Amino acid sequence: MKRLLIVFSILIIPIFIFLFVGKAPISDDITWGVTFSSNYAIDLGLDWKEAYLEILDDLSPKRIRIATQWNDLEPEKRIYHFEDLDWQIEEAEMRQIDFILTVGMKTPRWPECHIPYWANDLNKEEQQEEVLTFLETVILRYKDHPNLIAWQIENEPFLDFGVCPWYDKGFFLKEIDLANTIDPDTPKLVTESGELSLWFLGAEIGDMVGTTMYRQTWWHKAGGFYAKYPIPAVHYYRKALMIRKIFDKDVIVVELQGEPWGPVPTFILDLKEQEKSMNSEIFDKNIDYAIRSGFDEFYLWGVEWWYWMKTVNNQPEIWQKAKKLLR
């Protein structure tokens, strides 16, 4: 038993020190972007186009990750509604803002899997065929846009999170192969949980890895409670270092927490409850933490909420802080 403990210590302690001890070098050239979901803006009761233009013009992000939903783009089988997405891309390109386009069955914002009603009752194989057809249609439409810097295929495809009918790594590989066949020149971004993964699968499959970075979230276990991840900033840097050394792939932060994560959706959550997981002070701490992680590209999560706080609740503090950061 004693010998086993010694062997265990010899193996585990160096790994622990590597992943959790020390400081990351701070980048002196950080690119800040945002993620935007028109559906989330609508959930907050906003005029989503007005909010989007204000984000582009007042915050002036250098990059934007545009979240799409299958049920919006193909509300009826083979009948596509691209007008709103066309408009978002045109407005970004008019301002020379680069964009990442998310596409797939599972994309950002709850319930994660956004399946159109006509595909709900299809079996798994039939749904997968429809996803591939949808994916091909979207990539063919947008692949030649000059400001498109990456395709994000699905959202955290290896994480069992959200209301989804299935998870299938083999099918995800088919999606990536299809995307590479149609548009071999644009990098394919594969996203993973920053807190619950080492990112090896994403790095093996994608051209680059996108990670989340959440600090304060609501856990539904044991009756529910707020929890702060006990992870030092250097942890993300060291994992990214492994990815670069082993796979020669870059890692960026695609979701840096900038809004509340409470027991119910934010748009029905009491303001006082929202402040438990996001307020002006927490926002500052999250930005400081992100900088100390050593990364040089971040996409902030919650820009629609900042606009809602500013315009509906007359609390512009986080919007103003983000404005200074993004410009």
What are these regions (language model features)?
Residues 1-16:
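N-terminal Sec-pathway targeting helices
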Residues 17-62, 67:
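Boundary/entry segment of secreted carbohydrate-active catalytic domains
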Residues 32-36, 64-66, 99-103, 149-153, ...:
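Hydrophobic faces of well-ordered beta-strands that scaffold small-molecule active sites
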Residues 42-58, 130-141, 193-202, 279-289:
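Short, acidic/polar
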Residues 49-120, 163-190, 204:
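Aromatic-lined substrate-binding rim segments of carbohydrate-active enzymes
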Residues 106-110, 131-166, 299-300:
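Active-site groove signature of glycoside hydrolases
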Residues 149, 250-326:
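Substrate-binding cleft of secreted/luminal carbohydrate-active enzymes
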Residues 186-266, 316-322:
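Glycoside hydrolase catalytic-domain groove-lining segments
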